[in-house]
């Protein structure tokens, strides 16, 4: 591995002409956030920038996605993929700054604007160094991370020839200039469920003439809590949370039915499948015990469950070594496992993958006139990005790809 490549790429990304372009890209995208599978303006911006760079691409992929290819001129080799998600969230931005969202009720509150901007600058860095690497780099500008867009990209076959894939996500718990991840399970698999428990409505003064679905639903909610407490390994994270419940409209009427729903999470995809099976069994069983019937729906057609994001050990070690060479060992951390979910898990199921957090915690250099150095959570209307992190992410993408391609083209182990 080159001991200087990462630092050279970072220096290039921090150069005034690069850094200004990078900030401008992120701010333009930030002002016009688009929801899942509606990223038409963002997709057009990506294609225009790729055209200007002379980078070939395929479009549309999964409705609004773009997959570009930078081919190394040093000879044949593996295919390495880099991915950035493009969608925003249905949140009203409450940060007052010059480049605030212009779209009512929509905001890039998860940093996907930064992801797209960093990958575009990585494309320029890669294009300018084509003579220095073998193989190909595919740049995946993916729609709808919040709508399983990664699953739909894979279905189209554009990554069938890819040997490995890498992506980053902004991390508010890390300062700019710091990156973090971990080997093995990193982010949880997730799914949602809804259930309808049906009994027999009647007068609340005569419960013996009714079949009460509220009692059945209450028993089901309590029993669901025992799945994690008594059936899962305490060293392997899992969550079952009932977050909605609705039944009845009047004080003196036992309703005909009750609906409830929630989310489930597991640090393994097998664990997620186990939770799904047990949730169905528990709800149906508690309904039957209370003389009711139940219909449980995991909404897999509309809200496809996300597999856990599991970092390939070799790819994690490779990306970590690149980061340490570029930023210094003190600025590369081992992150804890996180119950958040990411559709990058679909890629990691199919292709050896690594997923890293890029610190965007503000040190007063957010670049947008926001001097309050607060650390806001993802999905917050107050979310901000320290733009000093953007060149780090751009250079990290390019360095991870180039180093991997050259190591593997020369026959050495990744």
Curated annotation (Swiss-Prot):
Name of the gene: ILL4
EC number: 3.5.1.-
Entry coiled-coil feature ranges: none
Keywords: Hydrolase, Signal
Name this protein carries in UniProt: IAA-amino acid hydrolase ILR1-like 4
Biological function: Hydrolyzes certain amino acid conjugates of the plant growth regulator indole-3-acetic acid (IAA).
Gene3D superfamilies: 3.30.70.360, Zn peptidases (3.40.630.10)
Gene Ontology biological process terms, A to Z: auxin metabolic process
Organism in which the protein naturally occurs: Oryza sativa subsp. japonica
MF terms (GO), sorted A to Z: IAA-Ala conjugate hydrolase activity
Family, as annotated: Belongs to the peptidase M20 family.
InterPro entries found in the cross-reference section: Amidohydrolase, Bact_exopeptidase_dim_dom, ILR1-like_Hyd, Peptidase_M20, Peptidase_M20_dimer
């Amino acid at each position: 591995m080159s001991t200087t490549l990462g630092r050279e790429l970072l220096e290039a990304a921090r150069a005034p002409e690069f850094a200004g372009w990078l900030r401008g890209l992120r701010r333009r995208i930030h002002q016009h956030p688009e929801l899942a599978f509606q990223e038409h303006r963002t997709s057009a911006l990506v294609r225009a920038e790729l055209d200007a760079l002379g980078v070939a691409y395929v479009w549309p992929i999964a409705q609004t996605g773009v997959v570009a290819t930078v081919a190394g001129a040093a000879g044949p080799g593996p295919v390495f993929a880099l991915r950035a998600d493009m969608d925003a969230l249905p949140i009203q931005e409450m940060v007052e700054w010059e480049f605030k969202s212009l779209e009512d009720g929509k905001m890039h509150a998860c940093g996907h604007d930064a992801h797209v901007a960093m990958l575009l600058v990585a494309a320029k860095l890669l294009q300018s160094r084509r003579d220095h690497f073998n193989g190909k780099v595919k740049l995946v500008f993916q729609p709808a991370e919040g709508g399983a867009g990664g699953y739909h990209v894979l279905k189209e076959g554009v990554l069938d020839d890819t040997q490995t894939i890498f992506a980053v996500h902004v991390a508010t718990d890390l300062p700019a200039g710091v990156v973090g991840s971990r080997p093995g399970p990193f982010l949880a698999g997730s799914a949602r469920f809804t259930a309808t428990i049906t009994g027999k409505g009647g007068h609340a003064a005569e419960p013996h003439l009714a079949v009460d679905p509220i009692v059945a639903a209450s028993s089901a909610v309590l029993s669901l809590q025992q799945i994690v407490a008594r059936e899962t390994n305490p060293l392997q994270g899992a969550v079952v949370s009932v977050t909605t419940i609705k039944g009845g409209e009047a004080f003196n009427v036992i309703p005909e039915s009750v609906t409830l729903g929630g989310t489930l999470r597991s640090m393994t995809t097998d664990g997620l499948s186990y939770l799904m099976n047990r949730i169905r069994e528990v709800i149906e069983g508690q309904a039957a015990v209370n003389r009711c019937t139940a219909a449980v729906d995991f909404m897999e057609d509309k809200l496809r469950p996300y597999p856990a994001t599991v970092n390939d050990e070799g790819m994690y070690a490779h990306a970590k070594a690149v980061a340490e060479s570029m930023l210094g060992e003190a600025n590369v951390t081992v992150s804890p496992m996180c119950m958040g979910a990411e559709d990058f898990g679909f890629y990691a199921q199919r292709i050896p993958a690594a997923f890293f957090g890029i610190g965007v915690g503000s040190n007063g250099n957010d670049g947008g006139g926001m001097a309050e150095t607060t650390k806001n959570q993802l999905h917050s209307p107050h979310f901000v990005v320290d733009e000093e992190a953007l060149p780090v992410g751009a250079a990290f993408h390019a360095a991870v790809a180039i180093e991997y391609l050259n190591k593997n083209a020369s026959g050495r182990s990744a």
